[in-house]
UniProtKB/Swiss-Prot annotation:
Species this chain originates from: Prochlorococcus marinus (strain NATL2A)
Alphabetical UniProt keywords: Ribonucleoprotein, Ribosomal protein, RNA-binding, rRNA-binding
GO biological process: translation
HAMAP family tied to this protein: Ribosomal_uL14
Gene3D superfamilies: Ribosomal protein L14 (2.40.150.20)
SMART domains: Ribosomal_L14
Homology family: Belongs to the universal ribosomal protein uL14 family.
The name this protein goes by in its record: Large ribosomal subunit protein uL14
Function: Binds to 23S rRNA. Forms part of two intersubunit bridges in the 70S ribosome.
GO MF term (any one): large ribosomal subunit rRNA binding
Phylogenetic classification of the source organism: Bacteria, Bacillati, Cyanobacteriota, Cyanophyceae, Synechococcales
Record's subunit section: Part of the 50S ribosomal subunit. Forms a cluster with proteins L3 and L19. In the 70S ribosome, L14 and L19 interact and together make contacts with the 16S rRNA in bridges B5 and B8.
Ribonucleoprotein among keywords: yes
Any Pfam family matching the protein: Ribosomal_L14
Amino acid sequence: MIQQETFLTVADNSGAKRLQCIRVLGSNRRYAHVGDVIVASVKDAMPNMGVKKSDVVKAVVVRTRATMRRETGNSIRFDDNAAVLINDDQNPRGTRVFGPVARELRERNFTKIVSLAPEVI
């Protein structure tokens, strides 16, 4: 579960390395899960890239350390909390996605992120 002040790693090549969640988008929501959109601040970034430190960006959560129950009864959990930066059209800002992503992203219509990911779990 991602909430305000949570730090996340960035799973794409947009230039940001670490994010801090500012707000979970939705109607008065406290926690974000895989597939939810958050507003975050860039805390660490690579120089001469598209984003820089202290930029406020939108991102979609692709991995969480919290255990997730699926409708089939399986549970899944990842080693880190990670997000992919998106623009206002819900498309990723980077051209590559690193690490596995959850299958729930396809159900939330983030098919571009799923197609860029090396592994879908």
